[in-house]
């Protein structure tokens, strides 16, 4: 049921704190998010 949601949330909050880093990382976060979703789709019912 929990498909690694906690990690995603943590990243988002950290991003809010460091707004400068957010712009640089945004593209990588999106990529990682998509990759993780594909992996999680196999595990989760």
From Swiss-Prot:
GO term, biological process aspect, one: spermatogenesis
Keyword Glycosyltransferase belongs to the record: no
One cellular component term from this protein's GO annotations in UniProt: nucleus
Tissue expression notes: Testis.
Keywords from the UniProt entry: Chromosome, Developmental protein, Differentiation, DNA condensation, DNA-binding, Nucleosome core, Nucleus, Spermatogenesis
Basic residues bias (residue ranges): 1-23
Any one GO molecular-function label of the UniProt entry: DNA binding
Span list, region Disordered: 1-26
Domain of life: Eukaryota
Entry keyword Signal: no
Location(s) in or outside the cell: Nucleus; Chromosome
Function: Protamines substitute for histones in the chromatin of sperm during the haploid phase of spermatogenesis. They compact sperm DNA into a highly condensed, stable and inactive complex.
Protein's name in the database: Protamine Z2
Organism the protein comes from: Scyliorhinus canicula
């Amino acid at each position: 049921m929990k498909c690694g949601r906690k990690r995603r949330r943590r990243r988002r909050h950290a991003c809010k704190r460091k707004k400068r880093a957010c712009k640089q990382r945004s593209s990588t976060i999106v990529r990682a998010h998509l990759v993780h979703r594909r992996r999680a789709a196999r595990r989760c019912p």
